[in-house]
Amino acid sequence: MIDRTKNESPAFEESPLTPNVSNLKPFPSQSNKISTPVTDHRRRRSSSVISHVEQETFEDENDQQMLPNMNATWVDQRGAWLIHIVVIVLLRLFYSLFGSTPKWTWTLTNMTYIIGFYIMFHLVKGTPFDFNGGAYDNLTMWEQINDETLYTPTRKFLLIVPIVLFLISNQYYRNDMTLFLSNLAVTVLIGVVPKLGITHRLRISIPGITGRAQIS
């Protein structure tokens, strides 16, 4: 007899969007819920200037594991790395059209890239996709990358880019102390410090300046 089981294809193939139930955590028993009630970290309010985002509850962690977070997975692609170089080159060409001197052209390029990156990766919270039940509503895109694993190759690349950009632009305004200090402050305080582990899940609230920037 001919064994046809090897030639037959499975009737159902797992879709990329099929929930990953293997990583889900077990639901706590009723006794655990009574002894240790679950608190929703997203509802907490703090009047202090500096606060720290609490770890997700088990419901949020399960929601995060259900489907891939498409808001952050694209950042790991090598093509996404190239986008940063292309954006910097385009900014440099754009500002050179106005006849600015090289030091001002590189200053505007440096500040535009770093501030734009900060708004996109460190200021806006949540995700435009509603696949995870709002489990990422309290996290920035930077905190969503690589499941919050620090110093991955992608994170290191994104950390090095503003530093290299500053070193390149520094060749043009090294004799101008004002521009040097301005670019140094922007690079360090906005381009580097928010990417370090000491600022992970850290929130600095300045009344009237920083607000609840979140994708809805």
Curated annotation (Swiss-Prot):
It holds the Pfam family ORMDL. The modification Phosphothreonine is found at residue 18. Phosphorylated in case of disruption of sphingolipid synthesis. Phosphorylation regulates the inhibitory activity of serine palmitoyltransferases (LCB1 and LCB2). Residues 1-50 are annotated as: Disordered. The keyword Lipid metabolism applies. It is found in: Endoplasmic reticulum membrane. GO terms for biological process: ceramide metabolic process; intracellular sphingolipid homeostasis; negative regulation of sphingolipid biosynthetic process; response to unfolded protein; sphingolipid biosynthetic process. The modification Phosphoserine is found at residues 9, 15, 22, 29, 51. InterPro entries: ORMDL (IPR007203). It is a multi-pass membrane protein. Disruption phenotype: Double knockout of ORM1 and ORM2 exhibits defect in ceramide synthesis, increasing the level of total sphingolipids and causing phytosphingosine and dihydrosphingosine to accumulate; the accumulation of phytosphingosine reduces the phosphorylation of both YPK1 and LAC1. The mutant also exhibits random distribution of actin patches between mother and daughter cells, and shows a defect in endocytosis. Residues 17-38 have a biased composition (Polar residues). Residues 1-78, 125-148, 199-216 are cytoplasmic. GO terms for cellular component: endoplasmic reticulum; endoplasmic reticulum membrane; serine palmitoyltransferase complex. It comes from the Eukaryota. Keywords: Endocytosis, Endoplasmic reticulum, Lipid metabolism, Membrane, Phosphoprotein, Sphingolipid metabolism, Transmembrane, Transmembrane helix. Signal peptide: none annotated. The chain crosses the membrane at residues 79-99, 104-124, 149-169, 178-198. Component of the SPOTS complex, at least composed of LCB1/2 (LCB1 and/or LCB2), ORM1/2 (ORM1 and/or ORM2), SAC1 and TSC3. Component of the SPOTS complex that acts as a negative regulator of sphingolipid synthesis. Acts by inhibiting serine palmitoyltransferases (LCB1 and LCB2) activity. Along with ORM1, plays a role in the phosphorylation of LAC1 and YPK1, the distribution of actin patches between mother and daughter cells, and in endocytosis. Belongs to the ORM family. Present with 5240 molecules/cell in log phase SD medium. This is Protein ORM2. The lineage of its organism: Eukaryota, Fungi, Dikarya, Ascomycota, Saccharomycotina. The gene is ORM2.
